[in-house]
Structures are given as C-alpha cells and as structure tokens.
Amino acid sequence: MAKQVLILPGDGIGPEIVAQARNVLDVVNNKFSLGLTFTEGLVGGAAIDTTGVPFPEETLATAEAADAILLGAVGGPKWDKLDMAIRPEKGLLGLRSGLELFANLRPAILYPQLAEASSLRPEVVAGLDILIVRELTGGIYFGKPRGVRTLENGEREGFNTYVYSESEIRRIGRVAFEAAQKRNKRLCSVDKANVLEVTVLWREVMDELAKEYPDVELSHMYVDNAAMQLVRAPKQFDVIVTGNMFGDILSDEAAMLTGSIGMLPSASLNAAGKGMYEPCHGSAPDIAGQNMANPLATILSAAMMLRYSLAAEDAAAAIEQAVSDVLDQGLRTRDIAGSSGESVSTQAMGEAVARVLADR
C-alpha cells in the first residue's frame, strides 16, 4: 500500500532545504521501492499570505490523512507584528495539538568530521550522542488562562499557566524510558522540583514509572544544573526527558555542542506513531533565498521519518550513511565550514547526498 507524505515547506529557508530533502526522498523512494506519494501544503507565514490564517483547515485535513509530515520551518520578522493568535508559529502549534504530537525526539550527535566546529574542545564532545525527549502539547505553552490584562491601577500584567496532568507526564515518560532501553539505558529527568509544584508531580511520576523499567537507570536534575552540565560534561547524558519549555531551551543548547543546529533533525510523534519531522533550526530569514542554508538537518529529518513512521529502516540508514560520506568528502555549508571558510551551496550539498545514494 502506498504511503502518503505531506510536505510543508513553510517560510524563510524552508522551501530551499525541503526541496533538497525531497530530492533525496525521490532517490530512496525509487531505489528501495517504497511506494511513497507526496502532497504539498501551506503552514505558517506562507499560509497567512495565501489564506489569512497560519494553519488552514485544508492543511489539517491533509495532515490527518497523511502517514507522515515533513516540515521546513515557520516564522519570520514579516509577521512579527501580527496578533499572537495568528502568527506563523501558531501553525506549528496547531499541527502538534491537532495531531496530538506529544513526544518530541531531538538527537544531538556530533559527527566526527565536524568535531572542530563544536564550541567546546574536541575531547569534551568527541563521541557525543544525546537524545532529548521533550513533551510537546502540555505545559506553559498551552496552559490556560493566559494573556495580558490591565490591573485596577492601570498597570499591564502578562500571565501564563504552567500545568501538567499525571497522564501527560506518564505517557512522555514511557517514550523516554523505552528510548533509553534501546540505547545505553540511562535516563535523566529534568525538572525544577525545588520551586515548581508542577515538576514535583513530574518527578513523582517518573519515579513511579522507573519501577516498570528496572533495566533503566533513572536520575533527576534541576534544569539550571542540566544547562550547566550540558556544557561542562555533556557525555554524561544518554537520554534526557523534560517538559515543553525546558526541552525547548535545552535541546537548542545541546544542538550547539554539535557544531551547528543545521545538522540536527527532530521527530514529533503521537501515540499511533504518526509523526511530523523537521529540522531543529528556525526559518533563518536573513539567509533565505541565498542558497547558503544547510539542508542536512532536513535530509536527516527525512531519514527519521522513514524510520519512525514509514517502516523503512534500510532507506533511513542509507540516507544517514550518505550524509556521513558527503562530510567525509569535505563538503561543508557555511555554518559548518570552520576555519577553512570554504563552503558549498544548499543545492550542491543536497545534490551530493542524492548522488551518493544513487551511486551506492
């Protein structure tokens, strides 16, 4: 049976990097006889410009019918003055909530070819391989009430609600424990249980879950210490599980340990295994249309999509090996060029990966 993939190029550099990932997918689709079909849709600023809203009903319907979604990026200064309710980022949040994509998997892997690109000394980051499991649909980003109000004295006050239910914590915990079982069996739960009651419950539920996974070593760490430890000794971590806001911050920090956020993919999954896959970086409007963005995170996101949602492990592994081979050849986009300064374009990098795949 054919598998349907929804392609959402989005904003900024999104269309450029997604185009290269699509070319790579076309190669493996033919090479491995995957039977994939592709549909494109609108989300974010591109959707606002066309339909007036960041997340059209048509996009949601197409996403619900698809087996997997590949997203470029959303947002940009063009839409910054819009009301919060209709900014491009609401399209991304709408996808996550509409498809119940509650689990975000963000690997932070340092390719040995890029050790010099890391902001830390090579001996600190050599062999780095961390997986951050972030809860996506709860916490302060979605809690209500929220808003800005005017007090009786005329002063404005902004407010948000930070809330997690036991069931939300438990389901993301299971994803993290099961991921740890398939890796080095170490899980660090990150919270702020010394201050926030929400994360007191978080810690209690993680401790309860640990009894069901006796082969996994569970530890706890406050988020401020975790941020410090990621810089001081990042290789102490195997799998990290945390809430929405903390995960948003820590995963970007971990990304920079690898040399460039342009190298890192991510997966957002629901309970049925349907996923949305996207690079960890943003829309980078400052370089949009200049053919200099790094497409590798998006290409690697496509590999994750093949692995987690489309049951095509061989094709996923082939893409990942092709990326490594291209790095071995010395090809670098500007963000990972290092001290040499020699770089190739978005298109050249994407074509190199596709060529390696086709020739193998």
Swiss-Prot record:
Its cofactor is Mg(2+); Mn(2+). Its EC number is 1.1.1.85. Mg(2+) binds at residues 224, 248, 252. One of its GO terms (biological process) is L-leucine biosynthetic process. InterPro entries: IsoCit/isopropylmalate_DH_CS (IPR019818), IsoPropMal-DH-like_dom (IPR024084), Isopropylmalate_DH (IPR004429). GO terms for cellular component: cytosol. Homodimer. Belongs to the isocitrate and isopropylmalate dehydrogenases family. LeuB type 1 subfamily. This is 3-isopropylmalate dehydrogenase. It comes from Hahella chejuensis (strain KCTC 2396). The lineage of its organism: Bacteria, Pseudomonadati, Pseudomonadota, Gammaproteobacteria, Oceanospirillales.
